[in-house]
């Protein structure tokens, strides 16, 4: 894995995966798309879609644990704080040889800079929330969300996917 290349690719994902508008019905549709995709692959994950301060969709699939809900919350907090993907922030911390606690004073009990939470961005409004998955390895959590967003927004996932490790 090339961190610099991944960070560049994640930046492109964040620029491309923007909703023209977003409402609870769209959250429900996206959440159900993610649920169906995860179920078809046998993923034991938790899925969360929220605007800042308001949950819009949550599902814990068979095999997901209460720990996944906590990981969702902590990853979502990273997106809320930085307005960037939790995976991008984690890679930046890895590059710097630092942690969120060291560099930003953010407690590990509240923030997880691991892949899986992606900014929910609306054209003309900016980042308004997050789309999060937890239960797979962090890179796979990140890519699961990106793949679902590509399908929802009509983008070619093969173009936006991170390079295979």
Swiss-Prot record:
It comes from the Bacteria. This is UPF0303 protein BceJ2315_15790. InterPro entries: PduO/GlcC-like, PduO/GlcC-like_sf, YBR137W-like. It comes from Burkholderia cenocepacia (strain ATCC BAA-245 / DSM 16553 / LMG 16656 / NCTC 13227 / J2315 / CF5610) (Burkholderia cepacia (strain J2315)). Belongs to the UPF0303 family. HAMAP family: UPF0303.
